[in-house]
Amino acid sequence: CSRAQPMTDALCVDGIQRAVRSLEKAFRDGNDLDAREDMALCALYSGMALANAGLGAVHGFAAPIGGMFDAPHGAVCAALLAPVWAANAKRVSNREKFDRVDDLLGGDAVSWLRGMTERLDIPKLSAWGICEGDLEEIARKAAAASSMKANPVSLGHDELIAILREAL
């Protein structure tokens, strides 16, 4: 996010490390208390980070989608994570933080996110009734969403449509 600073970066790095080791474990085995503790801390850290640094394009999309469709917020965000990360990574001028996340996620954040989305059976946006004909309205509303202001790059209309298409 464009308003990130050292405190939010530290929270996010620790949260990412915990999610890497525990997200799938907690998903598969709710009795794994160590994994659940890690994920509880991830949730806490992410709340602290978003309160201080803002959100970005994932939530910029999720707000209008949630208002237009009966779609769970978390599932929508998860479906959008990899396409948004890929779009941002192509355009960001300072790669330092993106490279750090790549390292934390085994060298390629987009591949890790796509793989985790598949392993956790996260539905595509089309599962919630979203179709090609809805993309223009979603993109228009997303572009105006307050969450988009903290995205690390300004995404144009065509980029917003491409992200949505990839997540369909």
Predicted feature descriptions by range:
Residues 1-53, 152:
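Carboxylate- and glycine-rich phosphate/diphosphate-binding segment that chelates Mg2+/Mn2+
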Residues 11, 15, 57, 76-80:
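Catalytic-loop motifs flanking and including active-site residues across diverse enzymes
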Residues 12, 36-39, 98, 135, ...:
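Hydrophobic packing residues in well-ordered alpha-helices of helical domains and bundles
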Residues 13-17, 56, 92-93, 112-120, ...:
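Short acidic alpha-helix initiation/capping motifs at coil-to-helix transition points
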Residues 39-47, 81, 113, 117, ...:
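Short alpha-helical scaffolding segments that buttress acidic/His motifs in well-ordered protein cores
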Residues 44-77, 145-150:
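Glycine-rich phosphate/pyrophosphate-binding beta-alpha loops
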Residues 67-134:
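Gly/Pro-rich interdomain helix-loop hinge
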Residues 132-168:
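Short, amphipathic C-terminal "tail helix"
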